[in-house]
């Protein structure tokens, strides 16, 4: 297994497309499985279509499911930070993707994105681990 860490600046963006970094890593490999893991308590990974309004739809859904102004018991950090800690329960911090001939096998409209509601931490670490077939 090969495993690397990649640092990503998400800044204030809710959705950061990470697909090109994953493609670059997979090109060095043949067939196998890629695990993408985000070792943070306030962010997750998702497969969505980007550039078609899905990012705004996702933001609206997160605001409905996890409103920032709810009275969370988890109170450190900026206002609404309690919801950030609930996000990975709804949007997993890991994905496992098939790789064939060094190419991740995504659907035509799928992109791998980091979903990050925590504006207090603008830099994230992503672990990419490849297991050969």
Predicted region positions:
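Active-site histidine-anchored catalytic micro-motif
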Residues: 1-133
